[in-house]
Structure formats: structure tokens, C-alpha cells
Amino acid sequence: MAREKRKLEHIEYALSTGQSRTHGFCDIEFVHKSLPNSSFESVTCETKIGELSLSSPIFINAMTGGGGERTLHINEQLAYVAKHHHLAMAVGSQMAALKEKREVDSYRIVRRVNPNGIVFANLGSEATVEQAKCAVDMIEANALQIHLNVIQELTMPEGDRDFKGVLKRIENIVLTSEVPVIVKEVGFGMSKETVQQLANIGVTAIDIGGQGGTNFAAVENERRNRMLSYFNDWGIQTASSIIEASSTNNTLSLIASGGIQTALDVAKAIALGAQATAFAGYFLRILMNEGMDTLIEEVELLHTDLRFIMTALGAKNILELQQVPLVVKGDTYHWLTQRGIDTMYYSQR
């Protein structure tokens, strides 16, 4: 019951704390193209994460599950949205269902609603090879997310305090998994060094989960008697983290998440190097406050607006969007300069 209570508290505080931190996309500006030689009707948005083909670069990221009927109902509605728009969808951490079998349905509902969709299983980096297999089998997943959440765990009153051996555990899962493994952050971003470490052990896809979206340090601090407020502003902003990851020149697929709310955010993330973008808190707030039909409408508008932006930039598809020129300025430019990353590549291509 304690785990179920925590899952429900996470939803409550995620909704109440909002997205108050900047993701850095305000520092990214496209170079206007007066002669784009493009047509809205010819713009397509298909993309790939590794070997997985997606009809959209937008997908529903891991949010919940394991909190009884309420989380089952949330996942059910999100699955209907995913099915309606042919979006990939990730479930929240399934460790709750591995510990408490009565919670299995709160995750399995996603596959029941969307039997032919692309669904991602999800576990923390403490997971074993056997637990990873069980999580994938539970929802007949097409891929497995392994989330890295050191700051959240440290801030969580009942969280983990020992993070030794994480890279080796992930490597073991990668070597034995029958589905692709996506390693993701949860709002604190990934550095180029972390990305390189993951590439070295055979990880083929990452979700940088940058600073700017749901603040899990703030969420966990709401549950503490003594706040660890120094973690509330911890992390690498989403825009900077995408560029850090891209600078490693690896072949791994890059997913951008962390405060993404608009089609312009999506376009900028892809132009910086992402193959796909993931929405969590923004979609959850619409679902909880305005309902499933409104969320379905919002996703439709996101796709329309993304195609408008791509038309303006002369990009007929996602690969062409990844090559349009843009300028990096402000705090993001200064961060990347200090990190030894040359942003001229983006403005001169």
C-alpha cells in the first residue's frame, strides 16, 4: 500500500508543481527561409528509433501505473489517445507490479486497449535481467525503458542511496533483452560523458530527459519533512542535453523530453539531433484537467503545427528537419562553449 500511495502522490505533486524551469529552447532560433520550395501536403512526419518505425516523432512518455484503479484509468485513457493517433506509449515503472501482482492490470490495460500499438515497458536501473524480461512480457512490449533517477531517489524519503553497479546491470539487460533498450533520464538531463558510457555498453537509444519539465526533485521535496531544496534546480536543460548527446557522434537514436509542450519545441528538438520527442507532464495535465477528448484534439494540433513549421523551413521529412540551419544563443550557447562543444555546426549547415 505504501508504494501505491507514493504513486498517487507523484501524480498529485507532479500536477501541482507544474513546469516552472526553462528547457532552453528559447535560446534556439531557426534561420528563416524565404524560398522554402515546399508544400504542406507533401510533409511527412514518420521517424525511427533504432529499428522501430514510428508514424510520428511525438510519443507519450512514462507517467504512471501501480497506483490502483486511478492509475489504471489514467493509463487506459492515455492508451486510447495513443491508439487514436498511432503514437508510441511508455508505461510508468513496473516495479510496483513485479512486487504486487494486483497492480499488473494498471499496466496491462495499455496493451489491452491498443493491441497493435508500439508500447514501451519501464523499470528503474536497479532492475535485474529477470525483472526486465518480466516487465516486457507483462505488456508484450516493443521496447524497454530503463530510467536513471539518482536525484529523485536521493530526494525521495524512502528512496535508494546506493547506485553502484548501475552501468553493469544495464549492460546485462542490453545483452539479454529480446527488445531494444532505451535508457532515459527523468528531468535532470544527460551529459555527453554519460551518453558515451551508455554507447560503449551497447545501448542503441537514449531519452535525455532534460531539465525543464516535471521536476521530480520538487515533487519528492513536497513529500519530505526537511526539504533538500538544493536539488530543485539541479540538472542540464533539455536543449543543452540534446546537443551534448549529439556531440558524441554515436549512432544511437536520440529521444528528447523535458518540458516539451509545443510543435515549435518538437521541431527545435529534432533539428538539434533528436529522432523523436516525448510528452509526459503536459499531456497529463490536459488529460486530468480537460479530459481525453481535449488531449486527442491537442495531439492533432501538434501534428498540424509541426507540419506548418516544417513547411516554412523547407523540410519535407524528419531527416531534412535535422539538417536545417539554426542559431544557438544565450545561456545555452555559454553552457555549450564551456563544455567544449562548437555550435557553429548548426548555424552553417
UniProtKB/Swiss-Prot annotation:
GO BP of this protein: isoprenoid biosynthetic process
Main localisation: cytoplasm
Reaction equation(s) it catalyzes: isopentenyl diphosphate = dimethylallyl diphosphate
Residue pairs linked by disulfide bridges in the UniProt entry: none
InterPro entries linked: Aldolase_TIM, FMN-dep_DH, IPdP_isomerase
GO molecular function: FMN binding; isopentenyl-diphosphate delta-isomerase activity; magnesium ion binding; NADPH binding; oxidoreductase activity
Cofactor(s) of this protein: FMN; NADPH; Mg(2+)
Pfam families: FMN_dh
Residues the entry annotates as binding FMN: A62, M63, T64, S93, N122, K184, T214, G258, G259, A280, G281
Cell location: Cytoplasm
Positions that bind Mg(2+): E153
SUPFAM superfamilies per record: FMN-linked oxidoreductases
Entry EC no(s): 5.3.3.2
Residues involved in substrate binding: R6, K7, Q152
Known partners and oligomeric status: Homooctamer. Dimer of tetramers.
Family, per entry: Belongs to the IPP isomerase type 2 family.
Function: Involved in the biosynthesis of isoprenoids. Catalyzes the 1,3-allylic rearrangement of the homoallylic substrate isopentenyl (IPP) to its allylic isomer, dimethylallyl diphosphate (DMAPP).
NCBIfam families on file: IPP_isom_2 (TIGR02151)
Protein name, as recorded: Isopentenyl-diphosphate delta-isomerase
Species assigned in the record: Bacillus cytotoxicus (strain DSM 22905 / CIP 110041 / 391-98 / NVH 391-98)
Lineage: Bacteria, Bacillati, Bacillota, Bacilli, Bacillales
